Amino acid sequence: MTHNDDDHKWVTTKRKEPIFFTVILFIFQIFMIICFAALTGYDTNKNYTGSENPDEFKGGEVQERVNNFYGYFRDINIMIFFGFGFLMTFLRRYGYSALGYTFIISALVSQWSVLLNGFFEAWSHSNKHGEFPSTWEFSMDSLLQGFFCSGSVMISYGAILGRVTPLHMLIMGIIEPIFFFLNVFIGEMNLEAIDVGGGMYIHLFGSVFGLTVAWFLTDRKSKECTDNAPSYSGDNFAMAGTLFLWMMWPSFNAAIAPLGEPQFRAIANTFLSLTGSTVATFIVSRLFSHLGNKLDMVHVQNSSLAGGVVQGCIAHMNINPGGAIAMGFIAGTISVCGYLFITPKVQRKLHIQDTCGILNLHCIPGFLGSIAAIFAAIKGLNNPNMYSKVEFEQIFRAGDSQASANLIATMVSIGLGIVGGLLVGVILLQLKKIKGLKSKEYYQDSAFWILPIDYPKDVATVVALNNAATSEDTAGGDDEEEGVGKEHGAVEMGKHNRIVQPKQDNKYHKQLPSDDEEEDEFKQEPI
């Protein structure tokens, strides 16, 4: 048996990828261990009570902060490692990668973010006091900032899910946090913009960053790949991720809100907004569905969360409970319409393959929330009696220029997302020379994971079931409206990544393989 040069090149480059991945990951981990040891430390003075009697020591205010902090830490921890991971398991042959990559990259980014956050805080301190600290305090806020940055990276990952190698994800996980904290440094530390739950810094920035990278990685074969489709079990697991994100989102938006009424409002407004977006999702999905007014699980998994995103900037502000529900309802409506009408046009006109639909879940709701924060700031400045004196000083840190500060921070978030995405996109294109996925490896675990015997092999069964379900609804003469006149014999990716097989005379064009054929296919495909 002979091998051509292309096969030899593919085998050679395939061996390079794990070497580069493991070496870079190992070196970067050693680098962070050294930096943590040399640059960070715990504050040992905050627990001092003035008493020399150890029996009187109970932790004081610090213990109260720890008790309050741990609940938020736990909830956000679940969101990042469980919620985002399982939300991406909808792809029928990509479950290992969705969970595994979110796991390792989130763990890495959580470490890297502590160092970057300490550096930019030290930079901000030097600008104000003229002295750059030699060591950085490792605090509870440091852990939260690590989670927030991990969330932004996971949002970006959603746009390129299925089309990247572990090395690609590692490079993006190293570079994106630099732009994330540069954005926070400009908007939070200098402009003092309002963004309690990361509507701008996490959702808007992360989604623009990911969509820009996706523009570089989108090609014709990725758009036509039939494995870019969900499975029944995958959708159920993804729905579990949605439910955990939905339940924990109030903690995400309230974690760093000022204590007292602002923190309570952040919890309440986020919850109410989530209920509004959930109701809107079921209404709009059922009303405008292209498949017989049936609910689409893609909408339920994603658009129901839009209420949490739209509250990211202003959850702690006095916006009225009815206003919170209305914002969630509007965000959910626009999100579903985005999946139905905007995403197909973006893919066709702009050539951006957005695997998870982050444009509709994070980008548009995040932008709406950022604009809402500008108007809420104007209203608050014109009606200062809406807040107590202490609340007003905590929320409107930029004073009379708060609205303009938020407008500038919104534009900066979009701009840095584009610039950072362009840089990473160019780098990932070059990395394809080391090991780029072949078209047959898109949206599959087989290239990088040891797989069990029941790993799904063919898409024909899913096509057949979809045809059987839709044929009942179109039996009354709706075939012309549903596009039966399309070219025969082609497997087409329908809207929302659903697989649609054109029909002819109520028979399937693609014959389902026999058990023996499936077994032969399994043996022939390299894992």
UniProtKB/Swiss-Prot annotation:
Gene3D superfamilies: Ammonium transporter AmtB like domains. Pfam families: Ammonium_transp (PF00909). SUPFAM superfamilies: Ammonium transporter. It is found in: Contractile vacuole; Membrane. Glycans are attached at residue 47. Residues 471-527 are annotated as: Disordered. GO terms for biological process: ammonium homeostasis; ammonium transmembrane transport. Keywords: Glycoprotein, Membrane, Transmembrane, Transmembrane helix, Transport, Vacuole. It is a multi-pass membrane protein. May be a carbon dioxide/bicarbonate transporter. Interacts with ap1g1. This is Rhesus-like glycoprotein A. The gene is rhgA.
